Amino acid sequence: MKSEDSTGRMAKGPNGKKQVYDWDAFYKTIQRLQPKAVMAIMGDDVRWVGNERGLGRETEWNATVLTPGIYARSTENNKRLGVFSKAEDLGSRKMLEKATELFWYPSEVDVSIRPGWFYHAEEDAKVKSLKHLSDIYFQSVGYNSVLLLNIPPDRKGLINEADVNRLEEFAAYREQIFADNRVKKGRNYWNAISGSEAVYSLEPGSEINLVMLQEDITKGQRVESFVVEALTDNGWKEVGKGTTIGYKRMLRFPVVKASQLRVKIDECRLTAHINQVAAYYAAPLQEVVQGEDWNNLPRAGWKQVADSPLTIDLGKSVTLASFTYAPSKAEAKPTMAFRYKFFVSMDGKHWKEVPANGEFSNIMHNPLPQTVTFGQKVQARYIKLEATTPTATTAKVGMDEIGVITTP
């Protein structure tokens, strides 16, 4: 179960009216009809990591002090501990000392294979690349999280061929990697304590750039910090380190030729139960660099006339079909635009508002380019964007975050 804004909060419709959900009715219906279904976010099975870009976190505990929202005591408990679903610390020893109960509440990382969560034919060429999907995999599943990859059906109820082809490539790439584990006896069970280490032999002539560690989570999650080293012709070389391991932790690093791996558990809680150490070679992938397909009017001819609201002289009169807001570096910032009004002018003095939806939907959690199509040809030399942040303060938008599509 997943609310429209991924947070479980009362989402707002285009008219700004809050949509109120009867969560208790949802819970009871799910538990009655499908008791084994995973109830995410507002349920108590998995929690949201805090973004919709497919990025997990360096430190991720499955056993957390966070009380799931399904329980009536959640608000009181979480307020007392000063935690919330996206809090950086949900399971450190310091937090455990304050808590009176723990919940097995693993992290879910969600992302769409396309720019948005729903199908649009004009995005058929914008399906995430194999490299992008692979990076997401290693930064979600490889960070002790569950990956929810959204694959939206088209208007016929089918998965588009572009999505299917990419998924097949993605599956084949992972199968190729994990078919060849270079560690000998990597499944020998290791009961580790703080300060202990274990050495594993590799197959002869091994070249590796990926290490996978796993804890036996049926006995809990215990590792707090670790280091991985490889024995090369020049001696032991550190290839990776981290904090938590959990069900699965994967480390990527430049290719090394090695004969052995050494895993050091620097800190853990009592005894950590390591049930697999593996090493692989992942063939490097190159990203296909594409131009800004959301802007076809060179910015070299633009001039920023004002900062707030952002006002731009396009340098000449053009016919606009759409404009796009693309948050810098695809990062969600407190100053980013959420609600907006878009104006055009021929002289920079007399302005006309272009009718539009007025909201960059869900951009706080999925800060990717959002295009607003006008539905009519709009003449303009000057454009102006009046925008407010998700907290209703004045937004700060740079000229490089705006694109326009012109039409004859």
Model-derived segments and spans:
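Mature catalytic domains of secreted/periplasmic carbohydrate-active enzymes
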Residues: M1-D233, E238-P254, K264-Q276, Y280-P284, ...
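Short surface loop/edge beta-strand patches of beta-sandwich-type extracellular domains
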Residues: Y200, L310-I312
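Predominantly extracellular/luminal regions of secreted and cell-surface proteins
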Residues: T100, P284-V305
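Trp- and acidic/polar-enriched beta-sheet ligand-binding modules for extracellular glycan
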Residues: W190-G195, I217-P284, V305-S308, S317, ...
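Positions in alpha-helical segments
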Residues: D135, S308-P309
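Short intrinsically disordered coil segments
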Residues: D124-K128, K185, T243-T244, V289-P298, ...
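Extended extracellular/luminal ectodomain segments enriched in beta-structured repeat modules
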Residues: E203-L210, A258, G315-T324, Q379-R381
